[in-house]
Amino acid sequence: MLDLFVPGYVKFDADNPPISGKGGLPPGFCQFRGIEVMCGPRGLPGEGDHLFRNNGDGTFTDVSEKAGVSDPKGYYGLASVFVDVDDDGWLDLLVANDSVPKYLYRNKHDGIFEDVSYLSGFALNDEGRAQASMGIAVGDYNRDGKVDFYVTNFSDDYNTLYRNEGEASFSDVSFQGGVANLTIPFLGWGTGFLDYDNDGLPDVFVANGHVYPGVDRQDWGTTWAQRPLLLRNLNGVKFEEVPPATNSGLADVVCARGAAFGDLFNDGHIDVVLNVMDGPPVLLRNVVKNSNHWLTLKLVGGPKSPRDAIGTKVFVTTGNVRQRADVFSGGSYASTSDPRVHFGLGVAEKVDKVEILWPSGAKQEVRVPAVDQILTVVEGKGIVAP
């Protein structure tokens, strides 16, 4: 059964909003680069986080304190995701917090989580500094079989690429990976790993937009509305920005927040939907044209796994290349994406092996008859008609 985690942000009273210099709130918490802005989050009381256990009868029980994830410090949570970071078969929990350290909770297999945020290296960046984190991308960008993370942050700071070193240990490789300097002018929100060109290497997409409309009246090198970023994975080590072609979706300047990913047209290309402040959603259709192949799998869990297969890991092998994808819900920011797992296969014309590790603990291999198709796989049964 699926449980529910809700990160808390601030305790806010709309009838008594925080005002600079009043109620014990220092004026500095209501300024940005010397101009008056809305107060917070620092200086405001934080809201705790909540983990609700599924009782199986349509009700939930709040087990936050018992499980060790209640956030007694009152950090400002914005995004969260369950994923198995140490590959022990149990889902761990990550939380992106605004202006304070991030959380990584390791599942102890008994309903309790251990806070390994600092021990893992995930709490802070490589400079030992907390960042104002907004969204989390989940994926194995270097194809070493371990899940990595990309975290979006506030402007005047860089987005953070965390490489999984194993045993729930992470290294900030943002500068080595080429994703640091180019992101500093942008304020990132929704994000995800996606293989936009189907070359077999997960790329990164970032939705951007500022929180202070007044930045447009200042000469700060940033703006309220911002274009998104698409970072192409070059070799599993380094990324480069895909230039925004004129009149393309990458050149569309909006104040974005959420970003959801999926093959909306079932054509083998991952598309993006942006949630925009004070405007309609924006659909970015992937129109990349090349001869690369792909494979998409819709997974259906059996009696001992969630039906939507949350927590499943899939490994696809073509030649000497082995890719990993995880089925998860959450991450990004204020968004949920297509749960189907998508693999770009590059020039490979056949799949040698598909290995599936279900949440129940069952392991299954399926034979893929051909590439460039969407297949439905049911736990214990294999490929079935859609």
Question: At which residue positions do the language-model features occur?
Answer:
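Beta-propeller blade termini
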Residues: 1-2, 53, 77-87, 91, ...
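Extended catalytic-interface subdomain
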Residues: 7, 50, 54, 139-141, ...
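Short, solvent-exposed beta-strand-terminating loops
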Residues: 8-22, 102
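Gly/Ser/Thr/Pro-enriched helix-cap/hinge segments flanking short amphipathic alpha-helices
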Residues: 178-181, 221-386
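Loop/turn-rich, solvent-exposed surfaces of beta-rich toroidal or solenoidal domains
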Residues: 147-153, 193, 197-213, 217-227, ...
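Hydrophobic beta-strand segments that make up the repeating blades of beta-propeller
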Residues: 3-8, 92-97, 146-153, 204-207, ...
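Structural signal for beta-propeller blades
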Residues: 13, 49-50, 101-104, 157-159, ...
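Blade-edge motifs of beta-propeller repeat domains
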Residues: 17-75, 106-131, 163-186, 217-254, ...
